[in-house]
Amino acid sequence: MNAFDFLTPPRSGKPRKNGITMVLDKGMGPASARDLMEISSDYVDFIKFGWGTLPLHRRDTVKEKVDMYRSFDVEPYPGGTLFEIAHLNDKVEEYFQEARSLGFETLEISNGTVEIETEEKCRLIEMAVDEGFMVLSEVGKKDPERDRLLEPDDRVRLVRADLRAGASMVLMEARESGQNIGIYDERGNIREDEFNHLTDRLPMDRIIWEAPQKSQQVYFILKIGPDVNLGNIPPEEITALETIRRGLRGDTLGKVNL
């Protein structure tokens, strides 16, 4: 039983179909990662090993962390940039084999940096699904100049293509900063016209909005509801985000209904 549980609005337990929280692991040690799970695993659904961090760590350490996360009912997966590097080097089959041997059951397929045409990306999603992986795809470009070339209708088309190819959910690119990328302006504010265009046309239960900033998290929760799917959450902000979801923080107190 949690402290003050009589003051805590209930929320759906895991495995959740909505209200997903994805957290970014940029290289935590096993002890720190376990401490994090001990205090906050109930509020985390996915944890992403950021970009290309995994090749810098020992295989036994990576496997230990993968197994540990899963023991807390948290699904770990490698960041999409690592997949793009594998594709660039014509090592996709080897990438799948290594991911499986390390214990990963979920992969991210993206084309945010490496040029992978939509048709090829969809083929790779299908390939990963056929290999037995759950796939999270990502839509958007890492380079703000390239990302700005995507109109809202382009994002809708790309999301739909990924879902048809077999992606379970689609991440909307915002990078670690949440600024000057995707639906965010240079200050991290949401471009509301673009946001509304996407929410009117896409299934919200299949979208994970990357929202590293607190103001962005509050916006999504007030606009879509506490069961909105949010990603790229810093590890130290897991509990804070959960309080926002439940109306246990001034930003949403009395404004959310679970």
From Swiss-Prot:
<dbReference type="Pfam" id="PF02679">
    <property type="entry name" value="ComA"/>
</dbReference>
<comment type="pathway">
    <text>Cofactor biosynthesis; coenzyme M biosynthesis; sulfoacetaldehyde from phosphoenolpyruvate and sulfite: step 1/4.</text>
</comment>
<dbReference type="GO" id="GO:0019295">
    <property type="term" value="P:coenzyme M biosynthetic process"/>
</dbReference>
<comment type="similarity">
    <text>Belongs to the phosphosulfolactate synthase family.</text>
</comment>
<comment type="function">
    <text>Catalyzes the addition of sulfite to phosphoenolpyruvate (PEP) to yield (2R)-phospho-3-sulfolactate (PSL).</text>
</comment>
<dbReference type="InterPro" id="IPR036112">
    <property type="entry name" value="ComA_synth_sf"/>
</dbReference>
<dbReference type="InterPro" id="IPR013785">
    <property type="entry name" value="Aldolase_TIM"/>
</dbReference>
<dbReference type="InterPro" id="IPR003830">
    <property type="entry name" value="ComA_synth"/>
</dbReference>
<dbReference type="InterPro" id="IPR022370">
    <property type="entry name" value="Arch_ComA"/>
</dbReference>
<keyword id="KW-0174">Coenzyme M biosynthesis</keyword>
<dbReference type="GO" id="GO:0043817">
    <property type="term" value="F:phosphosulfolactate synthase activity"/>
</dbReference>
<protein>
    <recommendedName>
        <fullName>Phosphosulfolactate synthase</fullName>
        <ecNumber>4.4.1.19</ecNumber>
    </recommendedName>
</protein>
<keyword id="KW-0456">Lyase</keyword>
